[in-house]
Regions:
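N-terminal presequence-like segments and the immediate start of the first folded domain
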Residues: 1-2, 6-208
Length: 208
């Protein structure tokens, strides 16, 4: 469904989801931060949720990206609500999550788009948005490695999942990512993303 469209009651679908998610997370303390997550539209009715669980022996660290404001502290200016009597819930997810057993480390990369700070990098060019998004992902991994600047990161990306707002963009985005991330498995899905002006969102897993 169109996550930024407003149903009959007038509120944005994605904001409704954020409001309910905020209420749920407020019932407990999240010592390891919020989950790495992607909230995305679907081409069918209803809601589908999947998640991974790990044992208590696994170290879990929330990851921030200094190019992007943490979504769970977004200002009201970028949250769309048409219910003046209701506090806007922020998107409760971390930019990424590091899971480590002291022998290997896996990074779950949340759904990432062409956002810097909390503002969309607005353009009609899906390739430009794709490359800004990939830069954001690479920078997130670079911060986890303690590096200020990144060399090529493709060898450390295990997989990517790309959500495209417009099905017609699939071929050119695939050609672009084949060049930027050679050898990385990429799945392409047609789905709506969280802001009307954004054309692509990418999530993934990196193995360090």
């Amino acid at each position: 469904s169109d996550v930024y469209k407003r149903p009959a009651h007038g509120n944005q679908c994605y904001q409704d989801f954020n409001d309910v998610r905020s209420q749920f997370y407020a019932t407990s303390e999240w010592q390891s931060g919020y989950p790495a997550a992607t909230g995305i539209g679907a081409q069918h009715g209803g809601i589908q949720i999947d998640f991974n669980a790990v044992s208590g022996k696994i170290g879990i660290i929330p990851l921030d990206n200094d190019w992007q404001r943490a979504a769970h502290v977004y200002s009201d200016e970028v949250l769309i609500s048409h219910r003046p009597d209701t506090e806007k819930g922020t998107p409760k997810f971390e930019r990424g999550k590091s899971l480590s057993d002291h022998q290997q480390e896996v990074i779950y990369i949340s759904g990432t788009a062409a956002i810097r700070g909390e503002e969309s990098m607005v353009t009609g060019d899906v390739l430009w948005q794709t490359e800004i998004t990939l830069e954001n992902i690479q920078h997130l991994i670079g911060l986890e490695e303690g590096k200020e600047k990144l060399p090529e990161h493709s060898g450390k990306l295990e997989l990517l999942r790309v959500y495209l707002k417009n099905e017609k963009d699939a071929q050119i985005v695939k050609e672009d990512l084949d060049k930027l991330c050679p050898g990385v498995p990429v799945a392409y899905l047609y789905a709506d993303v969280c802001r009307e002006e954004l054309l692509v969102e990418i999530e993934g897993i990196a193995h360090l």
